[in-house]
């Protein structure tokens, strides 16, 4: 799940999926990018850098708690550049964007908030 930490749609999408994640039906990897800088005066980059400075196991909980401030770690800019390279490679249109491998081996993709969380979870399979 590619997200912009300042994107309300990314927040809502994760909230929709939370019960599936907690029940073990779905595993979500959150990849912070910064695409809203022109609209938020650079806050997206600052927030993404703060999240990427956290240990991997704390990134999502920090984002959910709105804890997206702090001094970036030395490797955070490189991690953000790598995430932005992923975004460019997949021609990211906005956030959230979901990419997954379907049970039949094909790629699944959803740009935006899922209209049917059940369909998304079923498409991901196990």
Residue positions per predicted region:
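Alpha-helical scaffold elements lining the catalytic groove of polysaccharide deacetylases
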Residues: 70-79, 83
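Structural alpha/beta surface segment adjacent to cysteine/selenocysteine redox centers
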Residues: 1-73, 88, 93
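Short, charged/polar low-complexity linear motifs in solvent-exposed/disordered segments
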Residues: 27-28, 78, 125-126
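Non-catalytic, surface beta->alpha helical segment in thiol-disulfide oxidoreductase systems
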Residues: 99-126
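C-terminal structured interaction module
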Residues: 83-99
């Amino acid at each position: 799940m590619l997200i912009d930490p300042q994107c309300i749609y990314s927040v809502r999408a994760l909230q929709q999926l939370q019960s599936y994640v907690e029940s073990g039906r779905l595993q979500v990897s959150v990849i912070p990018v910064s695409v809203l800088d022109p609209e938020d005066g650079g806050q997206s980059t600052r927030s993404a850098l703060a999240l990427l400075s956290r240990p991997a196991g704390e990134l999502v909980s920090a984002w959910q708690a709105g804890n997206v401030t702090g001094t970036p770690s030395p490797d955070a800019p490189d991690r953000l550049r790598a995430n932005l390279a992923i975004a460019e490679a997949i021609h990211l249109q906005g956030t959230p964007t979901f990419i997954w491998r379907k049970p039949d081996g094909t790629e699944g993709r959803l740009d935006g908030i899922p209209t049917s969380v059940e369909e998304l979870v079923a498409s991901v399979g196990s």
